[in-house]
Amino acid sequence: MGAACPRRPIGARILPMVIYCFDPERGRRWTERLTGIRPQFACVLGFTETALIPGISAAGLTPEARRFTALGDGEVLLAGRSARLPSAPEGYPSPVVISRAVVELLGLPVRVFDAGLPETCKDAVHLGGSPARCLSTGRALAPDTVAHLFSQGLAWGERLADEGGYLAIGECVAGGTTTALAVLRALGHAADGLVSSSHPRCNHTQKGALVDLALQKADLPIDASALAILAALGDPAQPAIAGMAIAASHRVPVLLAGGTQMLAVAAVAERLAAEAGLGWRPEQIAVGTTRWVAADPTADAALLAARIGVVPLLAAALDFSHSRHPALQAYERGYVKEGVGAGGLAIAAELAGIDSERLLAAIDDWLDRWNLPTPV
């Protein structure tokens, strides 16, 4: 396992909910600049048929339900309601409950982007992408689609940076930790056994075998471009988020709100920026996840971040042990862990001055309201 994730002070002020997991010096500098500032939040939704493989993901009650996980999360983010709250097979709720609670608590501006869903998300910004085929095909996305999504991400990154503050970017892609593993391996990073998942124990053997098959089918040359890697093995959210992060980071700090999937985005963004001659500002970027990912005994996010070596990894020390909802207490047993920007937004709440007790109360209160009738 990699290095532990110690808690660190920032100057005279201690941020008790922020854990610095990799590159703590850069992480402290990044958070110090943003204390007292609220972000704008962008969440990119996508779908990969990889999610339909039984057992590959727990981001949905059934494999078929995973077609609509991102749709439900997007609806909750935008409206606070959905016809269905996505949940794990055991019934534990999506981490969107954390994200939406922070959005309401801080009054954050939210944009949801549809990079490629099977069904349209109402009120989302449509980027003109498409769902990905299963990565086992070695032809997940059309190269033109990847290039278009990257271009759209760049354009939106510039536009969002114009609005000031800093930008937190989340994602929702069921099966996305597996596409992340595939992209990381194709980029040359030793990521096997390190990625997290929505399962309480990560299904490394299943993921690894699928990625082995995908790499064999893709038959990428050793000098394959980042766009070619994403076309062969990726999902539609990855090029869009990478473009957003690259463009926005030229002007404002960027928080990639997620775990394994956002570490993969950071790695591919570095390569994309170099190949496109766009300039790379890693000092402007941090990845922010949850303690449940950082402390996952069946993965190692800190070691993965160190092997990638691109940006600091932070984690929110959010604790559901004392939640009044047993379904949230299950997060402490390794279920769900992260998604929809949950960890990064919990860090944003801390930076904005919200303590852990107030944040937990807001999340509990939000889930209390979930069963109320939908307003007409």
UniProtKB/Swiss-Prot annotation:
The protein's matches in CDD domains, at most eight in alphabetical order, are given as: DMB-PRT_CobT
Organism of origin: Gloeobacter violaceus (strain ATCC 29082 / PCC 7421)
The record's similarity note reads:
Belongs to the UPF0284 family.
Q: GO molecular function: any one? A: nicotinate-nucleotide-dimethylbenzimidazole phosphoribosyltransferase activity
UniProt name for this protein: UPF0284 protein glr4139
Q: Which SUPFAM superfamilies would you find in this protein's record?
A: Nicotinate mononucleotide:5,6-dimethylbenzimidazole phosphoribosyltransferase (CobT) (SSF52733)
Family annotation (NCBIfam families): nicotinate mononucleotide-dependent phosphoribosyltransferase CobT (TIGR00303), PRK04447.1-6 (NF003373)
